[in-house]
Amino acid sequence: MTGIRFPLAVAIIALLSVPIAAQTVVRVGGNVRAPRQVKRVDPVYPEEAKKAGVSGVVILDATIGTEGSVVKAVVLRSIPMLDRAALDAVYQWEYEPTLLNGEPVEVVMTVTVNFTLK
């Protein structure tokens, strides 16, 4: 039992030493503006989807980390043949970090990735 106490105490102290703002994940909306995008990568349209005539919009929730990169993305509205390409693109997007009380915070926002056949 004592072997667990020390690592647990260290973990608790480490967690408590992180500023509250750094632990907060804020959803964009209301008074919280979406972060400004500084890099956008278009998705690579899968050949299989092109041949099948599949097009549409994949909707995702993207978590933007305190450094401005996408740290998590979850598909909300799926188009199975296009989901992987949408996720691959979104994970390359970059944003200016969002500040809360002067400290960078993670934000969650809904993003769309359009696939249009030409």
Task: Kindly give the residue locations of the regions a language model identified.
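Charge-biased low-complexity segments
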Residues: 2-118
